[in-house]
Design a protein with these regions (language model features):
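Active-site-adjacent structural elements in enzyme catalytic cores
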Residues: 1-344
Length: 344
C-alpha cells in the first residue's frame, strides 16, 4: 500500500481525506493533542483496520471525533446537562467525554463497552475532513501500540508508512499530549486520563471530580478499561525509563553517580549543565509546563532506539498541565520512580 502524503495547506486535501474515510480507509489526522489514526467510526471493518495497523488490543476503546459539538447527540443517549456545559466551555478542544453509547456505535469502536468517548477536536482541517466525510471518525493516537505518541506527520510515517492510506500533515501538535478524558456515566464524574483540560478547569464546571486510580498507579490487568491509556504499556521507548524525583541537586547527584556510557538523561532545559557528560536531552522548560507537554513525545521518540540501555527522566511536579505530563512519563516508566531525596 502506498501512503499518500496530504499537506493541510493543499485545498484538495480535505476532500481527498474525507473520500478515503467514506470508503473505509485509514487516514492519520492532525489534532491539537496528537495525531490520530482515523477511520469511519460506524464501520466495523474500517475500525478493525485501526487495531491491525497499530497492533492494538481489541478491548482498548476508541474515541469518536465529531465536527460539531451537537453531534454527540447522534451517538450518545441520556446525555446529562454536565456534558453540554463541558462542550460549551471546552469544545472544540482537548477534552473527551464518556457517555452512554447509542446502538449505532459498533462494539468494536467502544471496546465492547456500553459507553463511548466523544470529542470535538480543535483543528479546523480535521473538523472539515470529518464534516465532508459525513461520519464520526474513530481515532486513537497514530503510533504503534505501546510506543510514544505521534506529534508530527513524520512520526506517523515512521510508524505507518505503507500500512495506512494517507496522512494529513497539519504541522506539530500544539498541546502535545492526548486529550483529557472525563467519565460522566459515573457519579461524581471521574477523570480517566489527564490532558490539556486540567482537573482544576473541570472542577470549575462540574464541582466535584474524582480521579481514577489508573491515572497515578498501575491498573489491575483484569480491570475493564473505559478509556484509552488506562491499561497496557503506553508511551514507552525501547529502553527502560526511570524517573528520578527530588531536588535538582539531589537528582543530578544520583544520576551522575549511576550513569553508564550509552544511557541518556531526559531533563528540563534549566538542568542541562548539571548533566554534562551524561548525554542529556531537554524536553522543555520546568518553568513553562506547556513546553514540556509539547516536547514530551518528540524526545521520547528520539530516545526510542535499540542502542540506548536506560533513560533517566526528570518529571515536573504540581497540578494543572503538569499532572498530564506526569501521567505520561510515569506510564512510560512503568511507574518506576526513585526518590533521590531518600538516597543516602
Amino acid at each position: 500500500m502506498k501512503t499518500l502524503y496530504l499537506p493541510a495547506s493543499d485545498p484538495q486535501t480535505c476532500d481527498a481525506a474525507a473520500k478515503i474515510l467514506r470508503e473505509g480507509g485509514l487516514v492519520a489526522i492532525p489534532t491539537e493533542t496528537v495525531y490520530g489514526l482515523g477511520a469511519n467510526g460506524l464501520d466495523e471493518a474500517a475500525v478493525a483496520k485501526i487495531f491491525i495497523a497499530k497492533g492494538r488490543p481489541q478491548d482498548n476503546p476508541l474515541i469518536l471525533h465529531v465536527a460539531d459539538p451537537i453531534q454527540m447527540e447522534l451517538f450518545a443517549h441520556d446525555i446529562p446537562a454536565a456534558a453540554y456545559l463541558l462542550a460549551e466551555k471546552f469544545w472544540p478542544g482537548p477534552l473527551t467525554i464518556i457517555l452512554p453509547a447509542k446502538d449505532i456505535v459498533p462494539k468494536r469502536t467502544t471496546g465492547g463497552l456500553s459507553t463511548v468517548g466523544i470529542r470535538c477536536p480543535d483543528n479546523e482541517t480535521t473538523r472539515e475532513i470529518i464534516r465532508l466525510a459525513g461520519v464520526p471518525v474513530a481515532a486513537p493516537s497514530a503510533n504503534n501500540s505501546g510506543k510514544p505518541s505521534t506529534v508530527t506527520a513524520q512520526h506517523v510515517l515512521h510508524d505507518h508508512d505503507g500500512k495506512i492510506n494517507a496522512v494529513v500533515d497539519g504541522g506539530h501538535c500544539r498541546v502535545g499530549v492526548e486529550s483529557t478524558i472525563v467519565d460522566l456515566t459515573e457519579r461524581p464524574p471521574r477523570l480517566l486520563r489527564p490532558g490539556g483540560i486540567t482537573p482544576e478547569q473541570l472542577k470549575e464546571v462540574l464541582g466535584e471530580l474524582t480521579v481514577d486510580e489508573s491515572v497515578t498507579a498501575e491498573i489491575d490487568p483484569n480491570k475493564v478499561a473505559k478509556a484509552p491509556g488506562m491499561k497496557y504499556l503506553h508511551y514507552a521507548p525501547q529502553a527502560p525509563v526511570v524517573i528520578i524525583s527530588g531536588s535538582r541537586e539531589k537528582a543530578a547527584d544520583y544520576i551522575r553517580h549511576f550513569y553508564q556510557p550509552g544511557e541518556r538523561v531526559m531533563c528540563f532545559e534549566e538542568e542541562l549543565e548539571l548533566y554534562e557528560g551524561c548525554d542529556p536531552i531537554a524536553y522543555g522548560r520546568e518553568d513553562d509546563v506547556a513546553t514540556l507537554s509539547a516536547g514530551l513525545f518528540d524526545v521520547l521518540r528520539e530516545l526510542d532506539k535499540p542502542d540506548i540501555p536506560r533513560v533517566y527522566a526528570r518529571c515536573p511536579v504540581g497540578g494543572g498541565l503538569a499532572f498530564a505530563v506526569q501521567n505520561r512519563l510515569k506510564k512510560a516508566a512503568g511507574f518506576h520512580i526513585i526518590d533521590a531525596e531518600e538516597i543516602e
